[in-house]
């Protein structure tokens, strides 16, 4: 089983499905042609690693070399720890495996079998006349419920995922000034779960300017709506606390154990949960930058998987059918959409 990142000799990822309408990834490992310029939404490179191996790490050195062929100087040390700590923790890797499409399909199959068996066993308590007609009705009922579950799964995948997309906030915040966005997707090849880290070029200056103007306008005319939407942009985080932080000297003497700890015994650190705001109140320019950093990974995932909502017009993209990040944030994050956009 190969546990090395799957890269081609030029440093870019191997062949990947990229069928998003209106854009096409640049050839990996090939320098830009004469007069060719990078366009917003262009895929620069993709790193692929086998999620079933341990330990694993992204070959960010190869990504750095690939970005240099496009004239983008981004030292890997600026975001290495941010990207790897966000995506390669054991609990995150397990979540990616259990949230993969084959696992959802397997769950749907098990759900269908269980529902069919329960409905059929219940129907035997009543006289339904023709046996085959009863079996057909049971099958139709189980199929409709399973299809409903599949639709729920698909709608769930179109929302911003706090366990993957939003964990790239710090890394994207460091890469915004380099005009690069990171996004993560997963796929299954054979029996291997593969994590794909996408590097996408995007000039976000105009998007940041539009969002700052939009936030400034909302503060003057729709402040209650702005506060309501931003209050939903929060995550629950666990932080370590010191048990002696809020205790005085007299309490320390009372709490001191009389017997020494047993050798080799380790006490679990005290943890507390806190609700952290993703976009705190600040100047409109700072809030706009933070919104782009928070939802940059979400936008990139929708872009490379062709799941972005169709737009009648675009502000800062070459394709008229693909919305730019500020359009997505304006409509689905700061807008009046009633459906939640974060998955917990």
UniProtKB/Swiss-Prot annotation:
Keywords recorded for this protein, A-Z: Cell membrane, Membrane, Transmembrane, Transmembrane helix
Compartmental location: Cell membrane
Tree of life domain: Eukaryota
Topological category with respect to the lipid bilayer: Multi-pass membrane protein
Pfam families the UniProt entry points to: DUF4481
Location of the region described as Disordered in the Swiss-Prot/TrEMBL record: 1-31, 244-266
Cited InterPro entries: DUF4481
Name used for this protein in its record: Transmembrane protein 268
């Amino acid at each position: 089983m190969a546990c090395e990142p799957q890269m081609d000799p030029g440093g870019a990822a191997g062949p990947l499905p990229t069928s998003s309408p209106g854009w096409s990834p640049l050839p990996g490992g090939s320098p830009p042609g004469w007069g060719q310029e990078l366009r917003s939404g262009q895929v620069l490179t993709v790193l692929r690693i086998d999620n079933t191996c341990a330990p694993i790490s992204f070959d960010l050195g190869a990504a750095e070399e690939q970005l240099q062929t496009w004239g983008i100087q981004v030292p890997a040390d600026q975001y290495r720890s941010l990207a790897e700590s966000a995506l390669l923790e054991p609990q995150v890797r397990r979540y990616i495996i259990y949230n993969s499409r084959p696992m959802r399909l397997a769950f749907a199959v098990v759900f269908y079998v269980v529902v069919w068996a329960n409905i059929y066993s219940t129907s035997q308590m009543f006289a339904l006349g023709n046996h085959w007609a009863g079996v057909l009705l049971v099958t139709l009922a189980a199929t409709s419920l399973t299809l409903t579950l599949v639709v729920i799964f698909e709608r769930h995948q179109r929302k911003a995922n706090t366990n993957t997309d939003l964990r790239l906030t710090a890394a994207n915040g460091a890469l915004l000034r380099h005009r690069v966005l990171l996004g993560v997707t997963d796929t299954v090849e054979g029996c291997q779960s593969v994590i794909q880290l996408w590097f996408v070029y995007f000039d976000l200056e105009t998007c940041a300017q539009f969002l700052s103007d939009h936030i400034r306008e909302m503060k003057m005319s729709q402040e209650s709506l702005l506060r309501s939407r931003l209050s939903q942009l929060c995550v629950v985080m666990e932080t370590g606390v010191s048990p002696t932080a809020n205790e005085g000297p007299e309490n320390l003497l009372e709490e001191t154990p009389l017997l020494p700890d047993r050798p080799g015994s380790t006490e679990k650190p005290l943890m507390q949960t806190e609700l952290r705001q993703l976009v705190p109140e600040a100047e409109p320019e700072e809030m706009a930058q933070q919104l782009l950093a928070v939802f940059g990974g979400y936008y990139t995932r929708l872009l490379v998987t062709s799941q972005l909502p169709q737009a009648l017009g675009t502000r800062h993209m070459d394709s008229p059918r693909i919305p730019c990040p500020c359009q997505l944030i304006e409509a689905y994050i700061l807008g009046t959409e009633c459906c939640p956009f974060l998955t917990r």
